[in-house]
C-alpha cells in the first residue's frame, strides 16, 4: 500500500478511536463506572477482531516498538495462540491474558481495537431493517452499577464509521477475504493476504 494512503487510513482510524473513547467516557461517567481493578479482566476474553483496518493499526503500533519488546510480545502471542488452539480442541476455556497486557496495562493502548475500547458498558445497536439489539455490559459493571438506570450508549454510529473506513481500506487494497483473528493471531501474522 502506498505509504501516504496507509498513513491517511491510519489517521482516520485514530479519529474513529477518539470518537469511541469519548462516547465510552461519556457513558461511563453517566454511570460513575471506572474500568480498572477488575477481577474479570476483559484482557482474558478471547475476542475475535474482524477488520483489516484494525489489523493494520495494531501492526503499525507493534512495528514501532523496540525489537526486544516485539520479541517478548511475539513469544507471549505464540503461547496464547497455542492455548486457544488447545482450548478449541478440548472444549476448555482457560482465558489466557492478552499478550499485549504487561503488569495490567496494554502495551499498545492507543492502538487497541474497537472491542477493547467499548467493552463493559451496556449498549445498543440499531441495525437497518432489524429490531434494536441491547448488550448487557460485563459482570464487573453489573457488580458495581447494576442497579443504575440505563444510560443510552448507542454504538451504531461508531460501528458505522469503522465499517465505512474498513470498506474504503479493503477497496484500496483489493482485499476481499474476511478476517477473524485474536490479538495474538494479529501479532503473529505479518501480512494478511488474499
What residue spans do the PLM features occupy?
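Short loop/turn segments that flank or connect secondary-structure elements
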Residues: 1-41, 45-194
Amino acid at each position: 500500500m502506498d505509504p501516504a494512503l496507509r498513513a491517511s487510513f491510519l489517521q482516520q482510524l485514530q479519529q474513529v478511536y477518539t470518537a469511541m473513547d469519548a462516547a465510552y467516557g461519556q457513558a461511563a461517567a453517566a454511570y460513575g463506572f471506572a474500568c480498572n481493578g477488575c477481577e474479570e479482566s476483559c484482557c482474558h476474553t478471547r475476542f475475535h477482531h474482524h477488520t483489516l483496518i484494525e489489523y493494520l493499526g495494531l501492526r503499525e503500533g507493534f512495528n514501532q516498538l523496540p525489537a526486544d519488546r516485539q520479541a517478548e510480545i511475539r513469544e507471549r502471542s505464540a503461547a496464547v495462540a497455542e492455548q486457544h488452539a488447545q482450548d478449541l480442541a478440548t472444549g476448555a476455556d482457560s482465558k489466557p491474558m492478552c499478550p499485549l497486557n504487561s503488569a495490567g496495562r496494554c502495551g499498545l493502548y492507543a492502538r487497541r481495537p474497537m472491542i477493547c475500547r467499548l467493552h463493559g458498558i451496556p449498549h445498543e445497536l440499531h441495525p437497518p431493517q432489524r429490531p434494536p439489539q441491547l448488550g448487557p455490559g460485563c459482570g464487573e459493571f453489573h457488580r458495581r452499577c447494576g442497579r443504575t438506570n440505563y444510560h443510552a450508549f448507542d454504538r451504531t454510529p461508531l460501528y458505522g464509521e469503522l465499517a465505512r473506513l474498513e470498506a474504503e481500506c479493503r477497496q484500496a487494497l483489493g482485499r476481499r477475504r474476511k478476517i477473524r483473528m485474536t490479538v495474538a493471531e494479529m501479532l503473529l501474522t505479518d501480512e494478511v493476504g488474499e
